[in-house]
């Protein structure tokens, strides 16, 4: 049985350069909406971060030496981002990543972890160890390769939690194969299908039920949308609305025109704006049930590799002004949504939000109110890095309330 370990630090989640330095990029402390962190702040901030999500982190326990044994299934964009984010938390993390399932093998896993076209070169010593492991700053992580989760050696390795990052095993039957293989719990890094409980850190993760063996971290877009929608609904009352996410292309699209079940995603991703579906708006009701049936939306996939932006338009029941809407966001960002929500007052563009640790950054200058009851909000998010930080946070919550 694994126990949890929490840091007593009081530094908010996203303050200054922080974890972007672990990604191989220059520090994002230069972004004007963030203060410059001291080195002490930085080490505190990366040591452990779920303390900064209001009540979502659950009760704290004293630090112990035992850690949750974690395996990553699928070492693609989210799997590798997750490992970098976890590595950035340092020794204070209650997680211990001990295994990766990747069909590409050891050489490919180590190379793609070290060298990343979006994140840059990983500031860690990464190398293969024989034919079945990689080393990250001396930490040896076993690499296995099997497309069928039922065959994975999770029982033999004593795996407590599987980070399911393939995007394939998202229902109880599929994710349950990890439990059949000996793992105790599964965290899906995608919207779950069926009745799988969905949690968004900062929104409803305080309701986490440790008796559930399979949970979902929702989608990157839901993680961006839900925090500020929660603020809007609490302060002004949402009647109905629509959302458009202008979303960077993903691995589910085609580099050149080729077959795909979605005829639009079949078209060349780097050459087109690709309208497609998203369940993010409807999925908000999974974490904010009072909004069921009130939101819907679409996605526009665009030729950028990372960072996306949500455009939400809602009708509200309480008359308001743009300044009041932004102030509500500022208040939440300074309190219960510290480290989850930020407000930016500078005219930035998508690349400026690369490796942003938060789930959602409101572009304050673009907030509009038409009449007195139609509100338009624009919010940026790093759909890979920011989302992966929340996966680590939710895994930390699992560790904190392990049973």
Swiss-Prot record:
Catalysed reaction equations from the record: D-glyceraldehyde 3-phosphate + phosphate + NADP(+) = (2R)-3-phospho-glyceroyl phosphate + NADPH + H(+)
Residues the UniProt record annotates as site (Activates thiol group during catalysis): 247
Residues the record lists as binding NADP(+): 77-78, 102, 147, 383
Transit sequence range: 1-66
Positions bound to D-glyceraldehyde 3-phosphate: 219-221, 250, 265, 278-279, 301
One Pfam family in the UniProt entry: Gp_dh_N
Pathway: Carbohydrate biosynthesis; Calvin cycle
Main location: plastid
Any single Gene Ontology cellular-component annotation: chloroplast
One annotated GO molecular function: NADP binding
Protein localization: Plastid, Chloroplast
EC number per UniProt: 1.2.1.13
Catalytic residue positions: 220 (nucleophile)
Biological process, per Gene Ontology: glucose metabolic process; reductive pentose-phosphate cycle; response to light stimulus
Keywords recorded for this protein, A-Z: Calvin cycle, Chloroplast, NADP, Oxidoreductase, Plastid, Transit peptide
EC class: oxidoreductase
Family: Belongs to the glyceraldehyde-3-phosphate dehydrogenase family.
Quaternary organization: Tetramer of either four A chains (GAPDH 2) or two A and two B chains (GAPDH 1).
Additional detail: Plants contain two types of GAPDH: cytosolic forms which participate in glycolysis and chloroplast forms which participate in photosynthesis. All the forms are encoded by distinct genes.
Protein name: Glyceraldehyde-3-phosphate dehydrogenase A, chloroplastic
Organism for this UniProt entry: Zea mays (Maize)
